[in-house]
């Protein structure tokens, strides 16, 4: 097998408007872009990393450069899991290996993943934290959305007012909320009661990472999803008895290879499986679309926040997401 040529670059993506969550405001998204080619075929990958784990551009590019010789030697995707730890660096390289393998094999990446076909998936569209009025207006603006996720900030009365207004504006949609680690166990019972009154069907990451034990024995009428609390396959057991849903993000776990493994083990442990993404282009969304084929909840709206996406792009239509082979993972990708 010929040696691979690795190229690594970084890009700053402009957001159409600031994206607010508990404790953070994002105005741009910085991503690492990786290509691998063997002189005939090429694979590409993109990752934003995990901001709350200091997995930023510098960390990702340094990790990839340190492993350059091993990556250019052409490892398998499983071998890559031993070369790079979970995180954005591995996610970007993993995606490039998937696309390269698909091109070499002459089959789309989803077939390599064991699928016989792919279908559009229902995805949430996210309302970032803002004033009550602005958030309700944004929900109305998502006219074709069938599922909406609301970002909370840990301010109980304000958060419930936000949810109340959005539910009144959109009584028709599946509604979930993401607390982004903004609450304590002491406030959680009141939050859950208030959310249930407005038919909220998912509460994501209510407590800070590291406080998972506080949820042991907590009886919630709304399913609780682990995001920041479960980064990779090794952390899945920590969610048992504390969460109902596992939100798998390829930037967290290190790519589609481990993401598929996580989904399988999570189901075996009795969890529902959700797929999410960091803010990025369609190139980052496309590998997650393969995982989405196996998930009961899909939150893959990252490209919708950007001023400009890559072309070709994933397609959002009537509340659904579809990623064609031309976006990433085609059966033929010339170097």
Please name every model-derived segment.
Residues 303:
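Active-site cofactor/co-catalyst pockets and adjacent glycine-rich loops in catalytic enzymes
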Residues 150, 155-293, 307-319:
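Catalytic core of soluble alpha/beta enzymes
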Residues 1-175, 182-189, 193-197, 312-335:
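N-terminal capping/lid subdomain adjacent to the active-site entrance of alpha/beta enzymes
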């Amino acid at each position: 097998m010929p040696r691979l040529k690795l190229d690594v670059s970084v890009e700053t993506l402009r957001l159409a408007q600031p994206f607010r969550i508990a404790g953070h405001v994002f105005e741009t998204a910085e991503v690492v872009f990786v290509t691998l080619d063997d002189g005939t075929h090429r694979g590409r990958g993109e990752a934003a990393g995990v901001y709350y784990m200091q997995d930023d551009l510098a960390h990702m590019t340094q990790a990839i450069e340190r492993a350059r010789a091993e990556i250019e030697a052409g490892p398998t995707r499983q071998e890559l899991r031993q070369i790079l730890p979970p995180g954005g660096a591995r996610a970007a390289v993993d995606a490039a290996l998937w696309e390269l393998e698909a091109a070499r094999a002459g089959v789309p990446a989803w077939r390599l993943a064991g699928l016989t076909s792919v279908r559009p998936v229902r995805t949430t569209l996210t309302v970032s934290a803002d004033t009550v009025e602005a958030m309700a207006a944004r929900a109305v603006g998502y006219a074709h959305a069938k599922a909406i996720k609301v970002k909370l900030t840990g301010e109980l009365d304000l958060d419930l007012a936000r949810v109340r207004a959005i539910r009144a504006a959109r009584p028709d949609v599946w509604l979930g909320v993401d607390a982004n680690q903004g609450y304590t166990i002491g406030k959680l019972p009141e939050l859950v009661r208030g959310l249930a009154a407005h038919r909220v069907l998912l509460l994501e990451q209510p407590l800070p990472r590291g406080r998972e034990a506080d949820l042991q024995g907590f009886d919630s009428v709304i399913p609780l999803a682990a995001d920041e609390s479960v980064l990779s396959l090794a952390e899945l057991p920590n969610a048992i008895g504390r969460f109902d849903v596992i939100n798998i993000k390829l930037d967290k776990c290190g790519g589609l290879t481990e993401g598929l493994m996580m989904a399988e083990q999570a189901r075996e442990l009795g969890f529902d499986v959700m797929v999410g993404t960091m803010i990025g282009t369609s190139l980052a969304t496309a590998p997650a679309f393969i995982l989405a084929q196996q998930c009961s909840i899909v939150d893959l709206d990252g490209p919708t926040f950007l001023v400009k996406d890559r072309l070709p792009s994933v397609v959002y239509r009537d509340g659904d997401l579809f990623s064609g082979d031309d976006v990433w993972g085609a059966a033929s990708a010339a170097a």
